[in-house]
């Protein structure tokens, strides 16, 4: 869980990017060639006047549209839909901006309504201005968003708001129609979407100076209740968050990891806490309490960034009065504050990165759902891939009004993120909805349940009053008093309990009546009894409580009352309770008579009204005090900006406390006056009330006596059954005694002896099992230790085997090279032999022919013929010598090939011996434990690097000395005690020495300057080893090795190069 700071919603809202001033950058951008689509920025030159206008606060201006934020270019007209304009025109021709008619062609052809999509720009923040960001997107009129660098790229929406637009203007366009539809029984959803630090939370919640969508919607709901005569409303709220795909109840901190369920009306959260609200202040207090438990965190863009999605749900039930009753209408108003999507620019790590991944996953699923809904095809829609889309399934599927508010930043650094938000809004605009009113079955209607209970309780009171005379004479009063005194002795014990039950009944009627909010314009005659004046109080509170800032419904539930009174002065609360108890015996009962309806508000009504006023003021003082604390905490960062707010809050709190003290004084005076001026009619009504209570209690006593008779009959039946069971038990005991007397005592002793012997056997077995358990535990411990050592030895043997395999591979390559070379030499030898054989007959033939020709023509000179013959013999001898030399070379190559074959066979035998050794080590035999870790790494590197053959003899003595030292060091007494492994170890160490000599030769000759990896001999070297700085390994081998193959220095770090 992330840390939850104690700062509330107001401190977080004021630190949002909307509160930053919009100063102009010091320099203006210059035009450049290219376009946005080709990847090069093409900012237009703009002046300070034509760019985003400066303001001291984001909500300081009064413009409602986005057109005032910058001057419009000729040819730019507003539009109402969303569509991406086509290709970029050629540079020589003027840019043909699309018109509003072109952008709404697609939307006008659809039959159903669509999601309402509005765009809200925020100004450049201080950080963006200092960083030199420019305006990349801007509002072109009231319906278009256009790209600064490519004016042909434009999107059309229902409304576009510039940086100077207030939240109230956004609410009037985006949220007010949804709220009105919810009051008429149509479900509604309003949610803000955008990247992090774009102003979503500020738009939805706002602050003290400028409230957001949620406070404005709550205020609008209660104002619509006041303006709707003839209907009764019941309002409930719930507040939840989705943090890391886990649903938490913000109104109940214990409600964690709640589950989503589904019924006929849609999806709902199981176990969510719902609170009945009766005023805007009451609802806002729940929001403030929930914000204290919401997950927030800091990133590069925002100090208090939302780390979870929140859904504030307002459930509205309404029905008409009396004969005009047409059923109960039920609707839900969802006000959603989504967490911002995050990119790599936030540079979050650890928990923040994990939170961001969950946020991006849920928003990606939301985008996928919107995209599939906008296509209009019957495809699978992945609502269940995220908790957010699962809860929004009913809203997104078209069963209510949906309003999407996309908050975007015009900064060029967030150009791509803003473009993605605009494309998401464009897809959402194409989703069709078909909203309809909801009707609720009476059995599931909470307001109807309260009404039925109230009517039943009122019928009971009417039955109690029936037959009583409204006015009585003094004689009748005295008779009644005497009768009461006579019956008081018998009913005293029962009367106290019945008084408590009666008080609970009256308080329930009062509380249920308060929960039903009625308009002040309702002209229907008031109902009788206590519910009439309570409803009158709940309706006319705005006129009576003139000093209270909350000008809506007055009544709060009991839990909220206790919480609000706890923040007031304890002495005042005690005095109020004492006065109410003192006057409650007279004035509370007197208010239920028939004269109350004619005479207006009684003393009890006045005291109740004063008490409720004190409660409301105490709650407002507590809320103002918490807001003042948050502002004081925030003033550390911005003391000048919050000083005025702190002064205003302190002034309001002092005024409310002074007004509360005046009300407490008035309440004390009215209580004393009510006690002193109790009239005779109040006494008569009290007597009639007590008489009715006595008759009621007598009736209940008769009922209980009847119940007692039934219980006595059941008790008698149970007594009969108990007697029968007791008789059975006695018979069984007698049979048991007879059986025990008949059995001899010797049998008992024999059984005892058997039991003792069995017990001894069990004890012996348990001891044996304990001993075996201890033995097995020790063996297990030894086996674990032996297994660890064997694992180390097996790992070392595997390393040796892998290095031997590499050596075999290299030798196979060398054998292949030698065979190829041998083949070439054989071919050359055959060619030379053919030439030699072909020249001798040719010469002889040519000489014979020539002789015959010469004999035929003239006589040859013998001396010349001898000289020619001698020369030919010399050439023949030279060719024979060359042929002999080639044969000698061929024999040498054959010898080398045979040696390589033998060497390969020897290595294969060594490898097989090592695998045999590994197998023996695994079976628990003695291992080669004398080779330490350093020798193993050295031997492994020696085997790996000793693959190239060279004839140089440099550094042989040094290598032999080092190898002999290592060999002496590795020999231990354990080896001498195990002669079975001595031949194998001798062969292995001889092989290591041979590999060492080869490695020394290769380092001394050409491998010292080679750029081939010294381990795999395949890849080029690409890593500089530290601290030895040798450039001798490729990247994979450098990561696998722990020591340098050249100098045996332990590798601390690597520098990977790409050559």
Swiss-Prot record:
Compartments, record wording: Plastid, Chloroplast
Keyword Coiled coil: yes
UniProtKB keywords: ATP-binding, Chloroplast, Coiled coil, Metal-binding, Microtubule, Motor protein, Nucleotide-binding, Plastid, Transit peptide, Zinc, Zinc-finger
Biased composition (Low complexity): 1-35, 43-58, 70-87
Molecular function GO terms recorded: ATP binding; ATP hydrolysis activity; microtubule binding; microtubule motor activity; zinc ion binding
GO cellular component: chloroplast; cytoplasm; kinesin complex; microtubule
Protein name, per record: Kinesin-like protein KIN-7K, chloroplastic
Organism the protein comes from: Oryza sativa subsp. japonica (Rice)
Designated gene of the protein: KIN7K
